[in-house]
Structure formats: C-alpha cells, structure tokens
Amino acid sequence: MKGQETRGFQSEVKQLLHLMIHSLYSNKEIFLRELISNASDAADKLRFRALSQPDLYEGDGELRVRLSCDKEKRTLTFSDNGIGMRREEVIDNLGTIAKSGTKAFLESMGSDQLKDSQLIGQFGVGFYSAFIVADKVTVRTRAAGAKPDGGVFWESAGEGDYTIADITKPERGTEITLHLREGEDDFLDDWRLKSVIGKYSDHIVLPVEIETRSKSEEEGSDEEVVTWEKINKAQALWTRNKADISDDEYKEFYKHLSHDFSEPLSWSHNRVEGKQEYTSLLYIPAKAPWDMWNREHKHGLKLYVQRVFIMDDAEQFMPNYLRFVKGLIDSNDLPLNVSREILQDSRVTQNLKGALTKRALSMLEKLAKDDAQQYQSFWQEFGLVLKEGAGEDPTNGEAVAKLLRFASTHGDSPAQTVSLEEYVGRMVEGQEKIYYITADSYAAAKSSPHLELLRKKGIEVLLFSDRIDEWMMSYLTEFDGKAFQSVSKADPSLDKLADEEDEEQKEVEKALEPFVERVKTYLGERVKEVRLTHRLTDTPAVVTTDADDMTTQMAKLFAAAGQAAPEIKYIFELNPDHALVKRTANLGDDGAFGDWVELLLDQALLAERGTLDDPNQFIRRMNQLLNA
C-alpha cells in the first residue's frame, strides 16, 4: 500500500465513539440501519451526479448494497457501488465530525445525560455505529470517476487513531468490513440479518442483497455457487399507496431520513395532482436537535425530482420558524438540473413552500386538537422556534397565533399551556383587550405590581418571560379581533378598569395636586410625566411607558445584542391611597421629601427593570430612612 500513514481522530470523535459504544449497546442492531442508510445516500449522490456525467456509472448502473459474511474470520462486509470517496473525503468523513459546536456541546453535558442513547443519536452517528459490534473496521473505497489506483484504505480499532493508505480498487464504491467483537456472532446468521434488515431498511429505495452459498447442482461438482438474494422491497416509500404503508414503516423511514433515534410525533403523506404535481412526506419530530440554535445548523427537506434525489437540506421549501420539520418533497415540476440558486428564485418553489407551510401548520393544529398532552411535549421542545413565526410569516399569522402557548395568571404554574383561544374564551364581560406582561422571569412577571388591579377585577393576564416574547409582540398585534395590550404601558382601557371615582377620591386627588407638581419639579427631566393612578392596590408607585415608546424588555434585547437603544423616559405613577405616598406628600423638609421620592422611584424602577443604576445608593438611602 502506498502513502500509508497513521492519523489521530479529532478529539470529539474519540469522545463520541466511547460514549456511543456504551450508550447504544442495548440497541446495537441499529448499526445495520445506519450503514445501509449511508449506502443508500451514496447511491442517491451518484444518480444525481450521473445526470450530467453518465460516464460515472462506468458501465455499472444497477446500484445496490450487498452484505456478505465470513464465519471463519468472523467478519461482516457491506459493499456498495455508489459514489465512493477520495482520500480527502475519507479523512473528512471518517476522521472528524463536521458539526460546529460539537465539542462545546459534549463538554457541557453531564455524564448521566451522555448515557442517553437518544441524545447520542442526535449526532447522526452513521458510520461510527459499526464500532458498537466491531472491535476493528476496515474500509476500502474508490470515488466514481477516479482511476482504479485511486482507491483508499482506512482501518481503525475505534480508539485513538486510524490508518489510511492508497490502494488499487477496480470497482467503484465503498466496502466496509466489520471484525466482530466476541459475542456478536449472531450477526453472521442469515436469518438474523434478514430479520433486522426487514425491520429497519425495507423502505430503502436501494436494493439490499445478501450473499447465499449453495452447492452446485451439477453432478460430481463440489463447487459452491454464490448468489445474491434481494431482501427489501426497494421501492420508494413515498411513492406507495398510503393504505399499504404501516405506522412502523413510516416511523422507520423517519429514522432513516433524519438519523434520529426517537419516533416522530406525527407525519403527513400527501400526493397532489393538478396545477402542480408533487408528493410530500412531512414529519414532526419529538425531540429538538442539540444544535437547533446554531447558525450552521442544517435544516430543510430532502428534495427529489421525478423520484431522482437532488439534494439534502433544501431549506427553500419551509420557512425558518418551521426548521424542525423533517421530510421530503418529490416534485414533477422542477428540472432535474435544478440548483439551490434556481430554487431560490423559482415560482414553483415559492408555491410549493406556501403549500408545505400550510400543511405543516395544519399538522400541528391537528396534534394540538387531538392530543393536548403530546402537543405540550412538542411545545416544550419547539415553542421558542414557533414563536418566530409571528414575525416571519404574516400570511399565516392567524394559524401561527392559534398554535402559541403561554403561562398566565389563570394558573400557578410557569408551564406555557394557555392558548389564545382559551384566553379569549375566559375574557370577562366588558373586557376589550388581551392583556399581557413581559419580564425577565415567570416569577417577576407574576409578582409585577402592574397586575394588581387586573387581579382584583378577575381579569387574566398572559405572562411572558422568554427573550423572544417582546420581539414577537411587536408583530402580534391582535387575535380574533381583540388587540393586545401590555399592562406596563399607559393605556385608557386600563384606566377604565379602575372603579368610578367618587367625590371623596376627587377631593383626595385635588388635594394632592401640589404634591404631584412638587414631585415633577424635583425629578425634572428624569421622567416623562408624574401622575396619580388608581391601577394599584398594594404598591405605592410604578413606572410605565407611553404606547409608542420602547419597552423595558425591548431595550434589554437591544443591549444583549450590543446595540444602542434610546433612553426610556418613564411615566411615574403614584398610588394616592398608599400610606407611603401620603407620608411623602405631608413632608415639609425638602431633604426628607427628596429622599422619599427617590426611594419610591427606585422601588418602581427595580420592579420594572430588575436592576438599578446605583444599587448601593438605594441601599444607603433605605437604611437611612429606616433609622430616621
């Protein structure tokens, strides 16, 4: 062998191999599914490349993957005639995990979490699953279009390093030989192999063939005759009639498609004929991928044109807020030589995207209606992503809004379980708007003084504490004809909720007019306005913003993104019935008066923002007033 060298695995590969071998052992037969799935992908890629370069078939266009056993050597070999790999591709594909953030993710996980097979499965372990049952793996491969002496040899015991070399390989494709560990001989049994392949890979388009040996029927001959028996249907699952496909087949196809170990929550298989002809098979996963928030996270549908594989991760067919949807689309209206650039500008693509988006949203609506518990499980995994749809997809705004879930004052749990339809159904007589509050946490939202009057009136308030919520509400302006209203903003509808003023209240307010003017004079330009309010019951003062001003939470979003935000000028609202306000109003000494006004304002700012510009000064002032 020429060019032989020993190279070390990328550190993440070593860690993942160790974890995978131990965490996936109880489900060890999945290595068959993963390796056959890889062979299927290799065949798909060759078919696509051969559309423009038919010579890549090298006279062998019958694509398949073959399994053969050697019981004496205790080896199991997978051999395909797909696209194959060059030396650089072998190093990239078998020596590294080309996923940004993998190392940081592995380091952030506790040992117990990393024993979770579903978590490990999120990495798309693929080829590495061979080491669950093998103590050594040998790969021989040659890329389509390369010369016979352009083959590559790769071998590893799945520990710290691997050997790579140049070899001569007459046939195109990849051959993977597993040297089985002690106790894994059942995978040398034909019946066992057929059973597992039938379970996991019946839906694979690529024919899966198993080697069978029998004695020659010619008289006097001792020769063995080798034949290849096809053991799967080898028909694209999505082209079959829905009535002929079992739930288990749909679930296994999802695992093949997504390399996810969990079963999907739901799926939708549809064939559309007419103005556009296409077949789609969409899945809603049960678990979010570990790198869903990574900018380089690949998402999108697998694209076929007239049953010919074109590309993975075609993100042009699904909006970004539905990036968790898995599946495929097989179109009859796109050209076979379609590129990502053509897809981006294609009217066909835009029409398909619109139809598939509505399909995915209807799947979620059906899940929410038929199984609230399952939908709640979905929301915990993907709710934050779905909230992006309020701003990204105004066309389907109402459909997205119906799928949103929030915490509210209706219950005592931070769980986001309340739909907008449920909220509207519970609105009290005379209530015109949907009230909400945004805060840094559920606890801060629930205990906000802005809720006092609404609680007294029995009016439900939605409690928002996710970072995205404030951004979302800049787009989500109404639902079912009802406008949304932040309770931390000044609004006439909130003032209307206060009890009708009696003569006594009017007299109190008139008597406090000089006090309000005195506070205004003292604070000057630090606040936008000072006024009395009847929206409070237990709190002496709050700060609010005008309807058109930036909110506190939005300013925090700007700051977190490193962007400058305009300074917020708050409206300082005082509760005329509170003892501390009355006490402050009766102070004649300007120094004491100033201290009490500062204390009331700082309390209001602390409740609104969660922080103060000078907390030490606030503490000193409070201690001083307590000792007075």
Curated annotation (Swiss-Prot):
Keywords: ATP-binding, Chaperone, Cytoplasm, Nucleotide-binding, Stress response. It is found in: Cytoplasm. One of its GO terms (molecular function) is unfolded protein binding. One of its GO terms (cellular component) is cytoplasm. Residues 557-628 are annotated as: C. InterPro entries: HATPase_C_sf, Heat_shock_protein_90_CS, HSP90_C, Hsp90_fam, Hsp90_N, Ribosomal_Su5_D2-typ_SF. Residues 341-556 are annotated as: B. Molecular chaperone. Has ATPase activity. This is Chaperone protein HtpG. It comes from Sodalis glossinidius (strain morsitans). The gene is htpG.
